[in-house]
C-alpha cells in the first residue's frame, strides 16, 4: 500500500501523581478493576462500556496485559488518536485514557490536500482516515511514491500531528503496453479480435489510456463482417474530492447481410411479421444481433423494395461515437468496509446505414447514471467473506430524435419503438467466500430493469461470450431488461511449471426480455449452462485463458437458432510490457 494506516499508539509510561492530577481535571468517573493482587484504576474512558471493559480485563493475566489490551481495544474499534498513560504505585495501577485531536498534518504538497480536511477532528476514526487514504493511495501509486505515517506530540498530550514521510516506490513502472487476441466474438460481427492498449501514469496522478480493438477477419468466422475498428481514450485524476474522468469512444464496422423476403415485408420484428429473413446466424435473432428491424422500419415501411421471394444482400455500415464524464467519491472506508457513490454523464450518437437505402437506425441520446456501492469484509458461517452490493439508476435526458420514437404501433418490438427518454435500474451484487486455503466460492448477480420502455441499442442488456453464458456467442440473449447470475468454485492460484494456474468450475443462468411487447415478443427468454475455465499467468507479463461450457437449459428460444450460436470454447492471450 502506498500510504500506511497510522500505527497504534503504544501505552505511555507516566507517574501516578501526574495521572491523578490529570484525571481529576479531565475525567468524570474512574473505573476500578481487580486483576489478581492488583487494582487497575481506569480514567478518561469515553468509548468503552463497562461490559466491554470487564470483558477485556477478564482475559488479562497481568496488569501489563490489561493496559496493552485496553490500548489495543480503542484502536480496533477505530479510534486512532487514543493513548493510554499508565503508572504504578505499590499494588495500584493507574491508567488514564487521553482522547486526542488532530492538530496538524505534515505532508508533501502533493498529498497534503487529501488529509488537511481532517485537521481539528476530535475523534479521528479509521473510516475517516481511510476515506481520504483511498484516493491519496491511488495518486501516490501512479506517482511512484510510498508514505510512512507517524505521530508527533508537543506540550499538549491531546494534540497530535500526523507526519507523512515520502520515499520512492521500488520497481516503479509508469507505462503498460498490452497486446491481446481472443475469439470471444462480438454482438454484431466477427469471432476473432485483437486489442492493443497503452496506459501511462503521470507524476501528477493523471492516468491516460488509449485502446484499439480490431476484428481479425483474416482468420475466418467473420459472420458477414467486413471490418470492425474500435478506439477508446480514457483520462482520469484522483483529486481530494473524488476520482473524476473523461472517456471518449469511437466504433465503426461494415458487414454484409444476405436476406430473403417473402410475403408482406412490412411486418414487425417482434415475431408478428409474415416476412421471412434468412440471414445465417442473424435473422432468427435479428433484433438482438443487428440492433435493427430487418423486416420493417417505423410503421412498417420496408427497409428496401424487394419483389416477393427475392434474395438481397444488404451492405451495412455502423458508426458509434460517445463521450462520458464520470465521478466517484469515497464516503467511508476502512479495513473492513467501503461505501462509494458514482456519477456518469454520457452522450451517445449511434447509427446504422444500409447502402442504397439510407439510415436504418439513428439513435442519438444522452443519459445520467447515479450509483452507490458498498463492500464489506466479514466472517460468514465461519469463512472469510467479501460482500458487494451496488445499485445504479440511469435516466435518459434527451428528447427522441432520429429513429427513436418514430413507430406508433403497440405491443411490437421494433427499431422505431425505442426511446431516449428512459429510466433503468441496475442492481448488482457479489459474494466471495474463502472456503479453503486454496479455493473460494464466488456468486455474482448482474441485472437491468427498464421502466416499461424499449431502449436504444447501446443501452440494451445482452449476454453471451465474454459477457456471460459461455456456451454461446455474444448476443444470444438481448432485451431491454434482464438478469445474469454465476456461481463458481475458483482456485486461489496454484503454482504450475513456474506459472500461476487458476482453474474454475461454474454454472450460469441468464434471462432477457423486451418491455412493452405483446405475445411471444415479450416472452422472457432464458438460458443456463455449466463449464470450466483455466487461466495461466506469468507475473504481469503473460496471461492466457480457456473457457468451455455446455448448455443445460433454455426457454422460449428457437432450438435451430440457438444451436447456430453455440460454441465449443473461448480463449484469450494477453502480453504485457
Predicted feature locations:
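Post-signal-peptide, soluble extracytosolic/periplasmic N-terminal scaffold domains
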Residues: 1-170
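Outer-membrane beta-barrel initiation region
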Residues: 63, 83, 103-241, 273, ...
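Transmembrane beta-barrel strands of outer-membrane/channel proteins
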Residues: 149-151, 177-183, 196, 208-214, ...
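Residues that define the transmembrane beta-barrel architecture of outer-membrane proteins
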Residues: 158, 190-194, 227-231, 319-323, ...
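Short loop/turn motifs that connect adjacent beta-strands in outer-membrane beta-barrel proteins
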Residues: 170-174, 203-207, 238-245, 332-340, ...
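C-terminal outer-membrane beta-barrel translocator/porin domains of Gram-negative envelope proteins
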Residues: 353-501, 505-509, 513-515, 520, ...
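Outer-membrane beta-barrel "beta-signal"
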Residues: 536, 541, 563-577
Amino acid at each position: 500500500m502506498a500510504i500506511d494506516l497510522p500505527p497504534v499508539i503504544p501505552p505511555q509510561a507516566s507517574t501516578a501523581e501526574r495521572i491523578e492530577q490529570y484525571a481529576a481535571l479531565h475525567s468524570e468517573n474512574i473505573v476500578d478493576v481487580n486483576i489478581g493482587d492488583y487494582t487497575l484504576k481506569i480514567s478518561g474512558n469515553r468509548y468503552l462500556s463497562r461490559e466491554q471493559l470487564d470483558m477485556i480485563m477478564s482475559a488479562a493475566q497481568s496488569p501489563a496485559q490489561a493496559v496493552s489490551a485496553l490500548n489495543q481495544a480503542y484502536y480496533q474499534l477505530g479510534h486512532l488518536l487514543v493513548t493510554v498513560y499508565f503508572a504504578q504505585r505499590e499494588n495500584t495501577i493507574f491508567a488514564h485514557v487521553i482522547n486526542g485531536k488532530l492538530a496538524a498534518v505534515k505532508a508533501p504538497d502533493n498529498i497534503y490536500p487529501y488529509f488537511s480536511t481532517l485537521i481539528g477532528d476530535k475523534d479521528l476514526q479509521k473510516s475517516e482516515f481511510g476515506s481520504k487514504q483511498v484516493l491519496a493511495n491511488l495518486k501516490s501509486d501512479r506517482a511512484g511514491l510510498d508514505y510512512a505515517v507517524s505521530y508527533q506530540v508537543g506540550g499538549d498530550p491531546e494534540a497530535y500531528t500526523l507526519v507523512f514521510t515520502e520515499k520512492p516506490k521500488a520497481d516503479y513502472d509508469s507505462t503498460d503496453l498490452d497486446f491481446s487476441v481472443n475469439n470471444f466474438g462480438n454482438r454484431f460481427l466477427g469471432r476473432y479480435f485483437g486489442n492493443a492498449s497503452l496506459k501511462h501514469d503521470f507524476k501528477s496522478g493523471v492516468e491516460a489510456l488509449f485502446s484499439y480493438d480490431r476484428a481479425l477477419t483474416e482468420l475466418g468466422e467473420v459472420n458477414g463482417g467486413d471490418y470492425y475498428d474500435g478506439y477508446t481514450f480514457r483520462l482520469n485524476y484522483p483529486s481530494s474530492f473524488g476520482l473524476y474522468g473523461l472517456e471518449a469512444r469511437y466504433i465503426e464496422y461494415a458487414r454484409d447481410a444476405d436476406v430473403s423476403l417473402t410475403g408482406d415485408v412490412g411486418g414487425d420484428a417482434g415475431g408478428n411479421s409474415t416476412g421471412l429473413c434468412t440471414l445465417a446466424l442473424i435473422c432468427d435473432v435479428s433484433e438482438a444481433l443487428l440492433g435493427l428491424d430487418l423486416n420493417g422500419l417505423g410503421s412498417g415501411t420496408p427497409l428496401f423494395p424487394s419483389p416477393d421471394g427475392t434474395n438481397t444482400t444488404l451492405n451495412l455500415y455502423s458508426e458509434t461515437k460517445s463521450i462520458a464524464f464520470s465521478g466517484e467519491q469515497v464516503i467511508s472506508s476502512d479495513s473492513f468496509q467501503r461505501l462509494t457513490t458514482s456519477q456518469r454523464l454520457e452522450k451517445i450518437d449511434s447509427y446504422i446505414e444500409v447502402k442504397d437505402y439510407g439510415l436504418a437506425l439513428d439513435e442519438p441520446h444522452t443519459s445520467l447514471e447515479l450509483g452507490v456501492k458498498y463492500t464489506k469484509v466479514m466472517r460468514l458461517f465461519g469463512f472469510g467473506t467479501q460482500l458487494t452490493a451496488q445499485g445504479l439508476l440511469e435516466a435518459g435526458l434527451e428528447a427522441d430524435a432520429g429513429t427513436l420514437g418514430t413507430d406508433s404501433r403497440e405491443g411490437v418490438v421494433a427499431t422505431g419503438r425505442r426511446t431516449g427518454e428512459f429510466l433503468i435500474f441496475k442492481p448488482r451484487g457479489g459474494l466471495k467466500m474463502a472456503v479453503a486455503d486454496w479455493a473460494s466460492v464466488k456468486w455474482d448477480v448482474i441485472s437491468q430493469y427498464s421502466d416499461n420502455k424499449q431502449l436504444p441499442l447501446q443501452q440494451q442488456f445482452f449476454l453471451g461470450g465474454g459477457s456471460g453464458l459461455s456456451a454461446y456467442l455474444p448476443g444470444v440473449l438481448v432485451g431491454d431488461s434482464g438478469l445474469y447470475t454465476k456461481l463458481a468454485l475458483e482456485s486461489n492460484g496454484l503454482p504450475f511449471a513456474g506459472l500461476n494456474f487458476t482453474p474454475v468450475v461454474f454454472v450460469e443462468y441468464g434471462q432477457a426480455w423486451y418491455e412493452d411487447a405483446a405475445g411471444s415478443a415479450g416472452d422472457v427468454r432464458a438460458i443456463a449452462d455449466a463449464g470450466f475455465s483455466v487461466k495461466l499467468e506469468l507475473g504481469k507479463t503473460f496471461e492466457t485463458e480457456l473457457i468451455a461450457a455446455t448448455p443445460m437449459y433454455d426457454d422460449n428460444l428457437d432450438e435451430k437458432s440457438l444451436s447456430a450460436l453455440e460454441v465449443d470454447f473461448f480463449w484469450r492471450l494477453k502480453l504485457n510490457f
